[in-house]
């Protein structure tokens, strides 16, 4: 038990799927897991453990931003024995060829946050997904007929960023889209020696101004959720 997770040391599976929204964690537990049990609820950051196709899997929200992602990830790894974290969430597209509701496998992530540099003596280390998880997710997507794009993303510290040059710069560098957490997860995973992957769905387009409806988001997010669950299986 920690100040932010009121679970017992063995309550979490070694693999945790982490959406930003704790209510999405609840939805996944109730929709996809069998024998799911709520294991933490501090500050309503809900976490559950259950079974998917006979394998023990946990799901827990991580909140918004790198600081929140790293806080919960650090505690899961160091106090609850978690060995693998798969983030799922939304992404704002920054390339014309990336379309609404596309599923993105984030192979690496840049950031304007100082968080990763602080944990690496001021150096800007590369932050990338675990290749075995990335390859497995890509293979599973092809098997399930889910169209995915693989590439780099960018994790911004500010949702309402006043820098008008950011999106054009990301477009020039071929970055597929922008979120707020992936770089923090990958940096933490490298430092702690665990496996990590982010599977994201394009919910809005930074170049065209398009946005998904709630119904469209639910359908496309289900593809992402199911792909994450399949990737989590041993």
Curated annotation (Swiss-Prot):
CDD domains tied to this protein: PNP_EcPNPI-like
Enzyme nomenclature, EC number: 2.4.2.1
Annotated phosphate binding sites: 20, 24, 43, 87-90
Site, as annotated: Important for catalytic activity: 217
Catalyzed reactions per annotation: a purine D-ribonucleoside + phosphate = a purine nucleobase + alpha-D-ribose 1-phosphate; a purine 2'-deoxy-D-ribonucleoside + phosphate = a purine nucleobase + 2-deoxy-alpha-D-ribose 1-phosphate
Gene Ontology cellular-component annotations: cytosol
GO MF annotation terms: purine-nucleoside phosphorylase activity
Keywords linked to the UniProt accession: Glycosyltransferase, Transferase
GO BP field: purine nucleoside catabolic process
InterPro entries linked to this entry: DeoD-type (IPR004402), Nucleoside_phosphorylase_d (IPR000845), Nucleoside_phosphorylase_sf (IPR035994)
This protein's record includes keyword Transport: no
Active-site residues annotated for this sequence: 204 (proton donor)
Binding, a purine D-ribonucleoside: 4, 179-181, 203-204
Role played: Catalyzes the reversible phosphorolytic breakdown of the N-glycosidic bond in the beta-(deoxy)ribonucleoside molecules, with the formation of the corresponding free purine bases and pentose-1-phosphate.
Quaternary structure, from the entry: Homohexamer; trimer of homodimers.
Record NCBIfam families: deoD (TIGR00107), PRK05819.1 (NF004489), PRK13374.1 (NF009914)
Family, similarity comment: Belongs to the PNP/UDP phosphorylase family.
PANTHER family associated with the record: PURINE NUCLEOSIDE PHOSPHORYLASE DEOD-TYPE, URIDINE PHOSPHORYLASE
Protein name: Purine nucleoside phosphorylase DeoD-type
Annotated source species: Shewanella oneidensis (strain ATCC 700550 / JCM 31522 / CIP 106686 / LMG 19005 / NCIMB 14063 / MR-1)
Species lineage: Bacteria, Pseudomonadati, Pseudomonadota, Gammaproteobacteria, Alteromonadales
Gene from which the chain derives: deoD3
């Amino acid at each position: 038990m920690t100040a932010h997770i009121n679970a017992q040391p063995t309550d979490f599976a070694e693999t945790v799927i982490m959406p930003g929204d704790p209510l999405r964690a609840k939805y996944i537990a109730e929709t996809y897991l069998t024998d799911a049990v709520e294991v933490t609820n501090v500050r309503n950051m809900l976490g559950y453990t259950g079974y998917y196709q006979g394998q023990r899997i946990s799901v827990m929200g991580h909140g918004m931003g790198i600081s929140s992602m790293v806080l919960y990830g650090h505690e899961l790894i160091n106090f609850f024995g978690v060995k693998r974290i798969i983030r799922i969430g939304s992404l704002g597209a920054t390339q014309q060829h990336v379309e609404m509701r596309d599923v993105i496998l984030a192979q690496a992530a840049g950031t304007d946050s100082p968080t990763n540099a602080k944990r690496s003596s001021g150096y800007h280390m590369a932050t990338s997904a675990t290749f075995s998880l990335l390859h497995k997710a890509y293979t599973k997507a092809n098997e399930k007929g889910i169209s995915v794009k693989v590439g780099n993303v960018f994790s911004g510290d500010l949702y309402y960023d006043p820098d008008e040059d950011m999106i054009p710069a990301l477009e020039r560098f071929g970055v597929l889209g922008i979120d707020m957490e992936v770089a923090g997860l990958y940096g933490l995973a490298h430092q702690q020696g665990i496996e990590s992957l982010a599977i994201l769905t394009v919910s809005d387009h930074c170049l065209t101004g398009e946005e998904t409806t709630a119904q469209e988001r639910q359908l496309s997010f289900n593809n992402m959720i199911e792909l994450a669950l399949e990737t989590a299986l041993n």
